[in-house]
């Protein structure tokens, strides 16, 4: 092991087992953290169907599986990654759904990972080849000309427009990029949001199907509690 070989300091490893929770759980025997594919599968279904009331139950139900193999497991939560269709494509390029996905990722229990380009709303499907889900970042509004020449025929060229660049989104208070930044700051500001246990809400949960678009939970840590509420539907609640 790292420490047995003389390694010093903290060492953090994340494993990838691309399957449902019951198949992935045994791998916690050898690794402290695993990418959480079940998290994205459940969240994607909830967003595609506008139904949030089952989300917390779905997430909490898998935790005992992991605990069977490792008491200090770390869920490396994520949306899509480099081997899957992009989040933007899975959510129909809906800006609102992508914003909810980002907000849920950064307010749920786990150690979240953000796949590059996700914070800009990139889309792409594996059926067109790996390049379509691995588009490089367009940093400034003027950079699309160079990128267009090197990436032509490998990605959806509509992504290389000035409006989707980091520069443009950084200047737009309502952009997806700035939403990611806002929730990242909140997570870094409040330890309960970063490290707290996820607890089901007593009212807005899987038993309340009359308000099924709502997903709500508490994050709890050292006597502190924070309420998290998300609306997965189209109508205001």
What do these predicted ranges mean?
Residues 1-21:
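Active-site neighborhood of glycoside hydrolase catalytic domains
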Residues 15, 21-70:
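Glycan-processing catalytic domains of CAZymes
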Residues 19, 41-43, 84-85, 143-145:
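Short loop/turn segments at secondary-structure transitions that flank enzyme active sites
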Residues 11, 24, 28-31, 134, ...:
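Intrinsically disordered, low-complexity regions
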